[in-house]
Amino acid sequence: PYRRQRQMCIRDRYYLACLVQENPFIDPDYIEGLKTTKDKVKRERLLKGNWEYDDNPNALCSHDAICEIFGNKISIKTGTNYITGDIARFGADYARLAVWDGWHIIELQCFPVSKTTDIQTWIINKQKKYRIPNHKCIVDEDGVGGGVVDNCDIQGFVNNSTPFNGENYQNLQTQCGYKLADHINATEVGIDEDLISTADKEEIIRELEQLQTWKADSDGKLKLKPKEEIKMDIGCSPDWRDMFLMRAWFDYNEYDIPDDIERRLGITA
């Protein structure tokens, strides 16, 4: 991929990105040709400067569907709030946490260093602000996240655990990744644009584009592109992706309580 090749450039040379419109010597007809071309990949790369754009046959969701997330006016908001968080493993990378209204992110926090006390305080404060019970909060249970799960008494996400309902996935992370892709393709996922910087937006797009199917196991189970391969392609761990896909956990652990539950249980007549 383009990004991997760029990272292999000679150390004393630098890449300066610019758009074709910034070239004073370019033929105007060339630009018009890019605007009208039916080759979507060429238009995105050469006209809009989206060099990472690729119609990857293994992609679970399209570039356009991912971009619709930002400022999405038709995302699913239910009035039910959740918290999801990817806690950096043993203090490395960033910790990413979000408050959701349905499938729309309404608050976001990034911790450059995973201090569990800061993360726990943030989670508890948001629980109080939005009245979010413990069973509607989840963070990854690997590494540092395990302490947050125990101390806050919230749900723990175990990547390699068994998928729900006996579905044909390699593990829980794969199952939730595919489910997230379904929601993205249905234009149900959203985030308030004023919550993120341009750099974070670009990073989220890159990471969600890594939601790709991978070689099936010998038993035919569906797989996601491995994290090691993702790191090679984008140069970092997909923390944003993991924070997003944990929201899908609640699709398998949400139960509607009937309005007449007391009557059904024989508590009232």
Protein language model annotation of sequence segments:
Residues 1-10:
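Single conserved hydrophobic/aromatic residue that forms the stacking wall/gate
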Residues 16-23:
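Conserved AAA+ ATPase "SRH/arginine-finger" region at the nucleotide-binding site
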Residues 89-96:
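Short, flexible loop/turn motifs enriched in small residues
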Residues 99, 103-223, 264-269:
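Mg2+-dependent endonuclease catalytic cores in nucleic-acid-processing enzymes, primarily RNase H-like
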Residues 14-16, 83, 155-157:
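Hydrophobic/aromatic beta-strand patches that form the interior of the parallel beta-sheet core
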Residues 70, 109-110, 205, 209-269:
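Acidic two-metal-ion nuclease catalytic site recognized across multiple nuclease folds
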Residues 23-85, 99, 214-215, 219-221:
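ATPase catalytic-site recognition across NTP-hydrolyzing enzymes
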